[in-house]
């Protein structure tokens, strides 16, 4: 069967112009105009999706099948082009009957054209084919427009669903244009309103706990840039102002022995006039033994010295992915569970904004994994937020899973975050030694988010950073009172 793409090529129908007109009409629709005004960050993300729409429409037109009636008419037209005028005159009755049987828009006009001319000349033969071709072009264009209109309605419905989802989640997950773009890409999944309302619920809870949100932001920024010393130290001139004693006659501060003739005491000067003591005077002058006034004074001068200068390079520390382990034991239920899930949502927001990955592992008696920054991130986040914390605590398995993940190439610069109340048994020695090796050799960092003030110090000592968020009633009341 003839495809629409082949028909467009045969009749020289420009499908690109039709596609561009449809996309322009879609972008100018009132629904998108209102949405762009309300969520300007998502405008760029939707605009970046236009090439994908264009390619999808091309593919749809390319694979579309031409109706059998139009296919038969096109084949008849092609055969008629090969006929000479005498042959065309012979075949004309069959051609008119075929057009009538196919209900072609050209059938009535073709019969009128033939009836209006008693003789079929070569010019009439050419005119008949030209008008027939125009009729086929109109039919092909109409078919293209019908298919594009169907695709437009379907695409508009899809975009509206994604706009609804993105509009609901944009205040929660999109902190900048990068995050808005990634959020729009994630919204392509098949989600219902009731599903993503769970994210909205925990987003509202996070806004009610600004200290928890601030804690997540501090953890996300914890890998700051640092200065790295360079070994190629060189000598450079160093200028400084120094203060030193001077002989400026500011005030007399006492007596001293020196050779300063201008500051001689009168008795010393008197010995110079005595012949017997003259040589004694010169001896004491040479030896700087004459009694003189000691004057007190200061002066500032510039002193230039050379010393080795060590330059430091500003090394921006890469901000790698998050590997977050969440304790789902029974002691982490209730308010602790809400805080842990909201904290992970805050880390997801940071990961989207900074183009990082966010990998969640739930540990109790078994390990359950979710990647919140992938193409299915929203669905994964909903599944994670739907989990119930009712298991046991197996912190050792959590660390083993983290260390296994850190050994892969794509996670070598990840930050490991463990969210727990740390009321658990001590870690095995092999786990502790392996964690310390990763910290020492590979500079991996382990963060602890402590949800209780009663966590075991022996367990928490292994972490590089401990971020405390006490969920006890007293701490909750104090935080509320401060707000």
Curated annotation (Swiss-Prot):
The UniProt record lists the keyword tRNA processing: no
Primary localisation category: cytoplasm
Domain of life according to the entry: Bacteria
Subcellular location: Cytoplasm
InterPro entries from the UniProt entry: Uncharacterised_CoxE (IPR008912), Uncharacterised_ViaA (IPR023481), VWF_A (IPR002035), vWFA_dom_sf (IPR036465)
SMART domains: VWA
Listed Gene3D superfamilies: von Willebrand factor, type A domain
Record key words, sorted: Chaperone, Cytoplasm
Leader sequence residues: none
Any single Gene Ontology cellular-component annotation: cytosol
Function, in words: Component of the RavA-ViaA chaperone complex, which may act on the membrane to optimize the function of some of the respiratory chains. ViaA stimulates the ATPase activity of RavA.
Subunit: Homodimer. Interacts with RavA.
Entry's family note: Belongs to the ViaA family.
Name of the protein this chain belongs to: Regulatory protein ViaA
UniProt lineage: Bacteria, Pseudomonadati, Pseudomonadota, Gammaproteobacteria, Enterobacterales
Gene behind the chain: viaA
